[in-house]
Amino acid sequence: MTVTSPIVDRYAVFGHPIGHSKSPFIHGQFAALTQESLTYEAILAPIDGFEASLKSFFSSGGKGANVTVPFKEQAFALCDSLSAEAALAGAVNTLSLLADGSIRGDNTDGLGLVADLISHLGSLQHKRVLLVGAGGAARGCILPLLNAGVGQLVITNRTQTKAKDLVDIFSQLEEGIYKDKLQALSMSELTGEFELVINSTSASLAGELPPLPQSIIGSTTVCYDMMYGAMPTAFNQWALQQGAAKVIDGLGMLVGQAAKSFALWRTVEPDTAVVLKLLREKLQLDI
């Protein structure tokens, strides 16, 4: 009698570089927590060979994939269908191979951000929010923030025209229902304190800071940096020096977006708290 092994679904994350990725660890933990049978690997795709690598993965049994820099826009172009978040972001971080062989693209970055913010703050309803940066990371978070009920979303960027372009795009959605909540300002035009300041730029990775005025930070301001590390980021250190009430890094967003991807593939959303704690401990050990 021949015993056949059950087929285990394959998932992966594609990037270049990819060795630093925490995704295999995160999804491995999610699989264990939910008792889902799957494998998840990191794949280093050649800069000029992402499409071929992805097609090879899917043709050899891959069911879904995450995509990180620099391939999110290329992945977007390969999709047969898109979620609303992905369509507006112009980039995808999650690919699903559907039963008919087509590829669906999602962008779970903003959903992961909002989930992490709510876990810390309880609600985003009516908050005055400043979003620093107007690149892909910012663009993927605007709709989830608006859907979470923020009262005002001001977008600021070194190049103000990019911030204005984003405001113009999102102001036209749903017959203009978000128009009164959105505003683009240069960094020198920012006035008054914000309840929440989100840094979507990668400046902290180089130990740099966007040229923001100190006046945006008040004694109740919460600051969030999408970057993360074993030590507080440069942006969060600056925020604390200005008197911010609380600072949060992007590790929870990383785990949160992964949980949303996992749920799209497996129809079960894992608990993020346990995995976030493990990942935080792992970061400390790697110092």
From Swiss-Prot:
Pathway in which this enzyme or protein is active: Metabolic intermediate biosynthesis; chorismate biosynthesis; chorismate from D-erythrose 4-phosphate and phosphoenolpyruvate: step 4/7
Enzyme class: oxidoreductase
Protein name listed in UniProt: Shikimate dehydrogenase (NADP(+))
GO terms for MF: NADP binding; shikimate 3-dehydrogenase (NADP+) activity
NCBIfam families: aroE, PRK00258.1-2
Subunit composition and interactions: Homodimer.
A cellular component annotation (GO) from this entry: cytosol
Pfam families: SDH_C (PF18317), Shikimate_DH (PF01488), Shikimate_dh_N (PF08501)
Function statement: Involved in the biosynthesis of the chorismate, which leads to the biosynthesis of aromatic amino acids. Catalyzes the reversible NADPH linked reduction of 3-dehydroshikimate (DHSA) to yield shikimate (SA).
Record field: catalytic activity: shikimate + NADP(+) = 3-dehydroshikimate + NADPH + H(+)
Family that this chain belongs to: Belongs to the shikimate dehydrogenase family.
The keyword Ligase belongs to this UniProt entry's keyword annotation: no
Keywords recorded for this protein, A-Z: Amino-acid biosynthesis, Aromatic amino acid biosynthesis, NADP, Oxidoreductase
Species for this entry: Shewanella oneidensis (strain ATCC 700550 / JCM 31522 / CIP 106686 / LMG 19005 / NCIMB 14063 / MR-1)
Family matches, as SUPFAM superfamilies: Aminoacid dehydrogenase-like, N-terminal domain, NAD(P)-binding Rossmann-fold domains
Matches recorded under InterPro entries: Aminoacid_DH-like_N_sf, NAD(P)-bd_dom_sf, SDH_C, Shikimate_DH, Shikimate_DH-bd_N, Shikimate_DH_fam, Shikm_DH/Glu-tRNA_Rdtase
EC number: 1.1.1.25
Keyword check for Nucleotide-binding: no
Residues holding NADP(+): G133, A134, G135, G136, A137, N157, R158, T159, Q160, T161, K162, M226, G250
Active-site residues from the entry: K72 (proton acceptor)
Chain sites annotated for binding shikimate: S21, K22, S23, T68, N93, D109, Y228
Biological process annotations from GO: amino acid biosynthetic process; aromatic amino acid family biosynthetic process; chorismate biosynthetic process; shikimate metabolic process
